[in-house]
Amino acid sequence: MTKYNNKAPPSPAVLRGVSVVSVAASPSSFSLPHNLCLRRHCRSLEYDFSFLKPLYKVERERNHPKQGPSSDFQGLRFSFSTMAILGLIKRVTRITVNNSRVRVYPVRYFQSKDLSSTNLFNGEDAAKLPVLIVGAGPVGLVLSILLTKLGVKCAVVDKATSFSKHPQAHFINNRSMEIFRELDGLAEEIERSQPPVDLWRKFIYCTSLSGSTLGTVDHMQPQDFEKVVSPASVAHFSQYKLTNLLLKRLEDLGFHVRGSKESDGLEADSVVARQILMGHECVGIDANKDSITATVSFLKGGKHMKRNIQCSLLVGADGAGSAVRKLTEIEMRGERDLQKLVSVHFMSRELGEYLISNRPGMLFFIFNTDGIGVLVAHDLLQGEFVLQIPYYPPQQSLSDFSPEMCKMLIFNLVGHELSDLDVADIKPWVMHAEVAEKFMCCENRVILAGDAAHRFPPAGGFGMNTGIQDAHNLAWKIAALVQGSANSSILKTYETERRPIALSNTSLSVQNFRAAMSVPSALGLDPTVANSVHRFINKTVGSILPTGLQKAILDNVFALGRAQLSESLLNESNPLGNQRLSRLKSIFEGGKSLQLQFPAEDLGFRYLEGAIVPDNESEAGDPEVPSGRRRDYVPCAEPGSRLPHMYVKILSDSTREVIVSTLDLVSTEKVEFLLIISPLQESYELAHATFKVAKEFMASVKVCVVWPSSDDGLERKSNSALAPWENYVDVMEVKKQNGEGTSWWSICKMSERGSILVRPDQHIAWRAKSGITLDPTLHMRDVFTIILGKQ
């Protein structure tokens, strides 16, 4: 791989109290208090920019001819005549002073090109494809949908020749379901297609599926179904089924799935947008100052062929063994090889019907003298299951898990034979807890997302969900860059925001995995003992023993451990068995076993820095360290947080009652910010300023005016207060049928004089808890400058 160094000229920055931050919309808007002495500031400017070539002058007389020249202004004119910024600033159109900060607004500042010598999407030199996504899993497909809906052209390549039918991930948390609500009814279709919640709300611990029950944990609470904190519920839906629904939406957007043979018609060194090329493996990445060239390998007529694909950005969403990550030499950091397992995918409607009638659940933890395993019931109605079995290579090999051997193990764990058992797939996998040292490289042109950037234990279901949220965070930033409202530095905020979340979710997943191990430990099956024996055999004197003897030692150790699960020992009449069963009961009742839902982390994660404007009243420091226990979500409106959910009524539709979530007010079809205010004069003034500034930045903004709930029949419209601007919506708080309910601003813990600016990904970019005291136009210009990376 060839990395490039593209040294950009110094970007405008605060220098000795002076900041060059934005551009005025009109030359006539030049203003400066003529009685304000700026000689000291001018000397600072002259000193700080003395290395720049003089290119222009600022003439106060043009805008204040009656006042004539002043000595103060002469000094200012001389200082600004030295400010060329290496030729990037052609003309100054406004100078303002606010809180002793001199602001110079050059004409080109609001133009789409970055303040750097190279722009990612610069006209004639633009790459043929704006974005290439490597990996056609849920993360890559969701990203391609989001980008396409936002108007960004992209294509997808994947080394697999077909889409996997292995169920893999299956738990979809609240935040991911909220994102799926944006994808043309995907969340609703998942809710309709998934098994009924009563068939998967529990984890069951037993000696066999037809034997004694050691414990049952119900992971659903009443509030989980009331949609108080989220408009979406969690779901249990296999990954391959989700993939099918995502492909359906991509087809509706004009995408075509092609194999290596079907891609023959494409140009040799290009890929047109809206293509999903299967059987195309990324084998090389070459970066230069203008673009990325990905080399993909594919089979054609039995021969390995290669195709070069030129793009502006490349997103590696190609899973835990990411080729993109390896090609760019990005290291993973964390715990490796927590556990090796074999995953057995099988079908049995007979077993599904039995469990529906006797003990429905999502996960079954089975411990007996013949075997140990975790059974994932992906769909009891269809009889689809995956059995996870501990695996200890090299003493054990995949050949030890033949279909016949797996059938025997399944019968032992079920407690009886099944007449319709069909083993569909057997595959080994390794559990890691790692996060990439960085999510971006090659001047932010190569980006990692999903499992390519972080690998978690499956405990808690954070793997796919974190990846879906990666895509949601990244899509609007790429679109803002492509469409010209943001600078390329906005892409760096993807890593700044998402990597800390990945680290937190890694910690939480490990905590949850340790909690899962507490149950076998209580039964006398300490997993650390098995791992220690395995390490001893592989790394010490045991490694010189014949392979057959090594395997025999390992098998005997495991058999000895499982002997503690015999019915004669594990019962209340046996003192040791009674003690162990009492410990189990304590673990289950105390909520110390494996958990399924984590509302606080699912909905309450917050970006502490990035494309946000922190305020002085936000909680500082690192977020609370995950405990591995369920904590309820508490709504928060601090910058970086997800916008709180509340149902509101759209007042502009007089023909019918339209009730939506506050999350639904954020556009899914374009990069648009949402300003939420109250119907107050000062808030309307802020809205006018925000509209004006957004136009300068070539950004879109919509204003939402939240009216308090009332039945007085008075008209609630903001058209006259917001004219001539038209992109606004009036909404009214919806109270419960009994009249109870909390106001919007109370939920946000803010005054009604406050305001909230929401990003296109439904996270809060900025807020004012109780109004702003500064010039609203200047203030919002600073806000958009920070969010869009134009500092």
PLM region descriptions:
Residues 207-239, 298-300, 304-308, 356, ...:
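Conserved FAD/dinucleotide-binding core of flavoprotein oxidoreductases
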